Amino acid sequence: MPRTFPSDEASPRGPSAATTFHRFRTQVLAGVQDPQLRRFGFFALAAGAGLIPLMGGAAKAALQAAPTDGADNTLMLFGSALVLLMTPGLAFFYGGFTRSKNVLNTMMMSFFSMGLIGVLWVVIGYSLAFDTGFKSPFIGGLGAMWLNNVGGPLGDAPLAPGFPISATSFALFQGMFAIITPALISGALVERISFKAWFWFCLFWSLLVYSPMAHMVWGGGFLGAAEGMMGAIDFAGGTVVHIASGVAALVAAAILGPRTTWPNSKKPPHNVPFILLGAGLLWFGWFGFNGASMFASKTAGLPFLTTTTAASAGMLTWCLIEWFKDGKPTAVGAATGAVAGLVGITPAAGFVYMGPAIAIGALASAACLIAVRIKAAIQFDDSLDTFMVHGVGGTTGALLTGIFASKALVPADYFPAAAKVLESGGNLGLFFTQLKAVLFTYGFVAIATAIILWIIGAAVGLRVSPEEEERGLDFVAHGEEAYDPMTN
């Protein structure tokens, strides 16, 4: 039976996310005759410009809520599972890079995010990202705490009238992004941060940095592409996930300082097969990360294809540069290059075609490789190159989105602010809009991360002792060891 969202016009919090989105639907899309184009508008808007932009104005006659679409909702659920798989993939990827005495601790930092953020997102994180009660361009409200009234009594109500995705499926999908983002930061801090400090950092960073960023970009905030907003576009998380985690990693690594034995006794990765396994799982999961962000099974082929194409270009570019410069392509380089290409295409996946996808993957990979080598030259201890891959790769991808975005994939009906920028200033104008969004993200995330770490450091401390660092954090933090010392 079709369901409708309860009226909330009289609510002291004002219109809900569903009502606000419905207003946009009835005001802007009513004149679009092609049903497939109308549908694409919902998906493109949700993925790139913010699911609940605050448009204002009187809504037209309310439409009866249609049942959720089985194929599209299945894509959402399958995409959620794929994105969740990325976090164990990241654990293997990071774990392979560390010394054997720290591999469990490194992997646990990613796995623990699945537990902590998985609960935190349901309790309050989703609400801070997507509820519109505060009517703020910076952060959501508290009306959706505990996912209250999200999905209706049976959990099958659509996200908005006529929208084929259920609200619960959307909340689940977005929660997977919230889980992996702080896990990405851990790569800069492994082998020296205490697990207690990591617990508190994950909690506060997710609430005070990730959820506001998600709101500002996707939840109707000022960085989005809806009418009256900045006009920046981010298809699946170039700013929200990759730049945010990369900048946080850079700041955190600088505040923590280097490992006690670094760089005098740098060790090679202890398990390269782990790195390759992790990269493969990340690549596979990225189909959900980018592809399912289209929210439509019939039109998801484009971001699926641009995603894997950019990954291939990134891997090839990294290997060719190594081959030319060092004489041999490495397995670690192949894995890292693929991830760099995936990071680069994330903000652009639904806005570009194949040629630009190859260019973005290749250029992001090259930029990340240069950044990794600069880091080594200046001896900065970002342990696993988190900023160099996610910060630099995300920045490169976000800026190149401005250069390569196709007007056909950024229509004015669905991305009014971004389309206006493209119309008045072309791709160069969109490039500078993207640059403004990137610079804001750098500043906001850097300042917020520094404050969070300063408070945690004053309260419980940040680092383990030099003796504990020498012993290894597997045993110190967890009382376990990955390998039998008699056979290792």
Task: Briefly describe each language-model feature range.
Residues 3-40, 44-488:
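Glycine- and aromatic-enriched membrane alpha-helices
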